[in-house]
């Protein structure tokens, strides 16, 4: 068992202390820990190397987004033939001690498994955020399984199909190397899991989740990151359209677009009195138009 774990970061000073703490729970299960830096300040990069002195550090020198940073780490891992599992794990994700070993065993328990993941719980709780996602490849619609339910209500030990959230997942090297391929860097951020789900479906391999491993997405965010939240709305609007055009029929893509715009208008009508709600919808609409025009380059605001 030789697992390479990849974590990306960019000026995450506010996450560094808890990240180091979460890392202690799984570091002994790793063959290599790869930290990909998305163009941080020299001071933060110094802190990063001090915090993780034994890790492999890849400094992109620019912001490649989620997809670009993960791909840099994946490419590095694929160069080592000794590695037999690649783990993507967010720097604000906590996973139970021994969880990576259990995921590895689960990954190799079925030849058809390409990628696996744990049940993800809400911050420091036993409430489920998702137990994988159900997924309809014809419409691109995905829904979290067991969301908001107590983890004790999960009856299944494993579920095949659907897709695994991208912030905590393990795959065989050939999954990225020859079967499905690397992440689509045009996305930058948001939608990478859905894109992979479409491609996995076409490749005929499986994504699966197990309730025998628990992880917690702690959502450690910068409280002052208003621009980040707005531009997240932009990227979500843009990438929805991009992925619909990439994977769906024109009829399905148009229907999905109409439904999302209707939902946003209803949301806006309800929360029009809130300035941030108006701004977020505005950025979502801007992103939608960018997706329709094929403008996938406007990531500079990150």
What feature does the model see in each segment?
Residues 82-94:
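Short beta-strand-to-loop acidic/aromatic patch adjacent to the donor-nucleotide binding site
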């Amino acid at each position: 068992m030789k697992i390479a774990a990849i974590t990306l970061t960019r000026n995450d000073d506010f996450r560094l202390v808890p990240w180091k703490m979460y890392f202690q729970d799984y570091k002994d299960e790793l063959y290599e820990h790869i930290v990909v830096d998305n163009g941080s300040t020299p001071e933060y990069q110094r802190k990063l190397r001090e915090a993780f002195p034994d890790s492999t550090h890849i400094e992109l020198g620019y912001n490649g987004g989620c997809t670009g940073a993960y791909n840099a780490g994946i490419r590095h891992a694929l160069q080592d033939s000794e590695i037999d599992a690649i783990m993507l794990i967010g720097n604000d994700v906590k996973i139970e001690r021994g969880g990576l070993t259990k995921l590895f065993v689960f990954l190799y328990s079925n030849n058809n498994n390409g990628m696996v993941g744990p049940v993800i719980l809400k911050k420091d709780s036993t409430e489920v955020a998702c137990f994988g996602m159900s997924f309809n490849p014809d419409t691109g619609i995905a829904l979290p399984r067991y969301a908001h339910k107590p983890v004790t209500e999960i009856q299944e030990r494993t579920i095949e199909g659907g897709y695994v959230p991208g912030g905590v997942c393990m795959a065989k090297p050939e999954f990225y190397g020859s079967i499905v391929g690397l992440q689509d860097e045009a996305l930058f951020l948001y939608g990478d899991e859905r894109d992979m789900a479409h491609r996995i479906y076409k490749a005929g391999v499986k994504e699966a989740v197990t309730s025998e491993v628990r992880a917690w997405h702690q959502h450690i965010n910068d409280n002052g990151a208003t621009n980040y939240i707005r531009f997240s709305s932009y990227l979500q609007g843009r990438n929805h359209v991009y992925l619909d055009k990439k994977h769906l029929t024109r009829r399905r893509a148009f229907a999905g677009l109409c439904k999302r715009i209707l939902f946003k208008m209803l949301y806006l009508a309800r929360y029009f009195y809130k300035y941030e709600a108006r701004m977020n919808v505005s950025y979502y609409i801007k992103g939608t138009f960018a997706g329709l025009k094929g403008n996938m380059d406007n990531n500079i605001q990150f």
